[in-house]
Amino acid sequence: MKKLVLSLMSVLTLIIPFFTNAITTHAASYSELAAHWAPQIYQDVNADLDVRADFITNFNYDGDYLALNNWDNLLNYNENAYVYYKVSETLTHYFIEYDLFHARDDAYTRPLDAHENDFEGLFLVIRKDGSTYGTFQLMETMAHNQWYDYTNDPSITSGSDNVDGGVLFNGSHPKVFCQANGQSPSGGHGVKAYDGSSAPGGDGIVYDYTGTAQFPTNTSGSYTNHYGYALIEWGDLWNRRNDPNIFSSWGTIAGNNHTANSANAPWGWDDSDDGPALQGMNWSDPAHQVDVHLNGLGNFSHTYVVNPYFSHKIVLQNVQSLEDRDPFGGKSDVYIKAYVNGQGQTDARFWKKNDAPKNQIFNIAFGANDAEFGPNFSENYNTVYVAKPSNTNVEIHVYDSDGTSGDDDMGYLSAVVAPGTTKTWTDALTSNGQAKVSAVVSAQ
C-alpha cells in the first residue's frame, strides 16, 4: 500500500482525551463502552445523486428485511440515523466496531460503481488500563476494501499496513469522515479519519451520538447542521446472516440496482494487500488483524474474554514431516494451510519450517521459525478465529513450500465441525500419509 503517513509533529498536535487519572467506579458494559467511544461522523453529501442516499440509517429503515427494495424506497421512508456496533474483548483490549449503512452506493458512472445497499465502517482498539472506559490506542477504517490505520501513539509503527495519520477527538468521540456518493471513483461512503477540513463541495452534515435517531432536514453548509444517531448492536443482522432475503451469498448483501450483489457485510470485507489478515478478520479476529497491520503495540493479548462473532476457532498445535518432498530428496519446507468452506485461513506467512527433518515434531507459533511474514507478532499464539458458514467443511492441509515451482501437497485432515462441537486431531496422519498434525477446531 502506498498511503501518506503524517509526520510525527502532526500526530503530536492532534487532540486525544486522557483518562490516566480516571477513578474506576465500575466496569463499563459493552453498550456503555460503545456509547462512550461512539464516533462523531462528518458525512459529506451530494445532492446531484439524491442527498438522502448519503444519510446513514438501519438496514430495515423501510420497515422490512428485504434487501431488494432499499434503493427504491429511499424517498418513501425517513432514513433515521443509526450505527451498527459490536464489541470483542481480549485480556488487554476492547475492539469496538462501528458500521455505517447507506441504502444506495451511487456514482456518476452508473452502472459502474453504483449498487444497492452499502456498508463501510471502522473499529477502535481500546487498551484496558483499569479505568472505566480504557484508553484509546488506535483506529482502523474501511473504505472500499482498503484498510486505513490511525493512531496518536508515536510508538506504534507500520506493519503490513502503513500508519496513515492521527485521530482528532470531540471529547471521547473520534472524528471520522464519510465520503458522499460520487466523491470517489471506487464508490461512496468510504470512512477515514476526519482531518479538520471543510466539506467537499461545501455541503455536509455531522452525526453525533445522542441515543436518538434523527432524520436530517437541512444539509446546507459545511458541517453546520448536527443530527443525533442511535446505536444498534449487530446481533440483529448477524442472526439473519443466512437469510436469502438479505444476502445473495455468504457475507454479500443482495442488490439488483445497477451492479448487482455488490455490497459486503463486515464479515465479507477483504483488503487484498494487507498481509496475512484475511477476509473478515476485522469481524472474527480483530486482535490478529491489528497485530498484522501494525507494530509497537506493547502488551497485546490474543486471548479473548468475549468474542461472539466467529464461526470457527482453529488452533494449530504441531506438525511433523514424514517425507522429504523437496527436489532431489531435500527436506520438506512445511507449512499448514487451514481451509473453511474452501477458503484458506492460514498459510506460509503465519508459520513455516524450512528443511524440516522427518519424524521431528515442530510446535507452531505464528511468526516463528521461517514464517514468511517474519517475527512481527506481539506474542506467541497459534489460533485464528474465522467467520464462515456453519456446518461447512474444515480441512487442515500440510504443504511443502517450493516457491515458484508449485507447493507439494503432503495430505490433509478433514471434518465438518457442527456448531457447539469440537474436533481434535492428535498426531493425526494426513490423507496421503506424508505428515502428522495436531490441531483443534471448535465451532459456535
What are the functions of these language-model segments?
Residues 15-28:
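Sec-dependent signal peptide cleavage junction
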Residues 323-335, 365-385, 395-441:
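C2 and C2-like phospholipid-binding beta-sandwich domains
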Residues 316-363:
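Calcium-regulated, polybasic anionic-phospholipid
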Residues 1-4:
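Positively charged n-region of N-terminal signal peptides that target proteins for export
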Residues 29-32, 90, 110-121, 129-311, ...:
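Domain-length functional cores that host ligand/cofactor binding and catalytic or interaction surfaces
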Residues 28-106:
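N-terminal "first-domain core" detector
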Residues 97-107, 315-322, 398-401:
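Generic short beta-strand segments
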Residues 343-390:
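Tryptophan-paired
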